[in-house]
């Protein structure tokens, strides 16, 4: 009896060893994860990271471990990609494998995998296809949306003239303008600039954007499972997100009550009609939760990124008055002072185009991109990334890649001009990301940036309360987003 028991134990031991050897051989044949600092239990590599400067911390680690490395953000294992080559190889050359969406802990509190931006699989595919088609139907990429942007630019010019050249904080002047463009698409109408609810919504969006870029926001990315139950600034961020969700839900309810299926007024109507068409489809992704969350995606994404870029842009132009002077000269020569700028003017304005590109490159609004996730076991270079591995494509490292930009730390529009003064494209210009999950609002954002910058510069000179040499263009926060410092300025009529 004893002998048979020992034989059974021996067989189990042998079987266990064989299984472990088999797993080890498979891992060995597939390869290993990229190198990285050794993590501690639960806290991961927290001790090697500065949450005040997360982007810089990760770039510092890449100096030791190379352009592809593994980091543990608390219990989260993330593979980080640095530089043009690594990011493009992953997001373009292996686009399908890297097209999953990773975690964005603060936003996940409200979105929970719903909506077009933070979803995965068939849901992401269906909602993205629908959103792109519907935005196109409502004029994005066509003359219709250009007229809407021009109209809103006119409201902005009137508001800035109304300041009488006084020193102002431009933050909400710009965010009101940008937000009204996406509002006209998703809600069917613009807000009055004095609308208190509108201003409250803009403050909510700015507050969330800023929180995700602070030290606490980055700490939450690591330890959300614990911090979501604790008091702290994250609870205020949750309240802001909830306030935005409630506002969108209220808008959706209004549209449901007043819907005419034969005459959609806006994005919400179009989604509601699609819901009716698919109500008998058990696998449909067109239901109320995805409508509210997709609308919220568009509202936040269509407001904060462009308005932050404008805010950074005016600061950079005041820092570099020689650039502002050249912009004025080109506008006066190509457009003049009497007619409104058109998007087609862009083709004749290489300097303005270079300036806007350089503002986006230098401003680097989303430096670590939205996290990706590999959809299946993936071989990348000499490494093996198991299915579900999260990936940070460091867009900022591409925008500052010295192989493409001669002085990447400096603001210099020459980065996008050839020796003849003609605009030149760059493969490393990736502020909208690249690949299958790039920003599908890129066309709208490009049109807004050109028309808003050009219209403002046609009508005003920019004046800072500081001399150019004293203007600080380093960011206030760098986390999920890059947040420029608060500043005041005057818009002086030309």
UniProtKB/Swiss-Prot annotation:
InterPro entries: Cyt_P450, Cyt_P450_CS, Cyt_P450_E_grp-I, Cyt_P450_E_grp-I_CYP2A-like, Cyt_P450_sf, Cytochrome_P450_fam2. Changing residue 5 to R: In allele CYP2A6*13. Changing residue 471 to T: In allele CYP2A6*7. Keywords: Endoplasmic reticulum, Heme, Iron, Lipid metabolism, Membrane, Metal-binding, Microsome, Monooxygenase, NADP, Oxidoreductase. Changing residue 203 to S: In allele CYP2A6*16. The keyword Calcium does not apply. It catalyses: 1,4-cineole + reduced [NADPH--hemoprotein reductase] + O2 = 2-exo-hydroxy-1,4-cineole + oxidized [NADPH--hemoprotein reductase] + H2O + H(+). Changing residue 128 to L: In allele CYP2A6*26. Its EC number is 1.14.14.-. Liver. Changing residue 418 to D: In allele CYP2A6*28. Substrate binds at residues 107, 297. Changing residue 213 to A: No effect on phenacetin O-deethylation activity. Changing residue 300 to F: Increases phenacetin O-deethylation activity 3 fold. Increases phenacetin O-deethylation activity 8 fold. Increases phenacetin O-deethylation activity 10 fold. Increases phenacetin O-deethylation activity 12 fold. CDD domains: CYP2A (cd20668). It is a peripheral membrane protein. It is found in: Endoplasmic reticulum membrane; Microsome membrane. Induction: By phenobarbital and dexamethasone. Heme binds at residue 439. PANTHER family: CYTOCHROME P450 2A6 (PTHR24300:SF180), CYTOCHROME P450 508A4-RELATED (PTHR24300). Exhibits a high coumarin 7-hydroxylase activity. Can act in the hydroxylation of the anti-cancer drugs cyclophosphamide and ifosphamide. Competent in the metabolic activation of aflatoxin B1. Constitutes the major nicotine C-oxidase. Acts as a 1,4-cineole 2-exo-monooxygenase. Possesses low phenacetin O-deethylation activity. Belongs to the cytochrome P450 family. This is Cytochrome P450 2A6. The lineage of its organism: Eukaryota, Metazoa, Chordata, Craniata, Vertebrata.
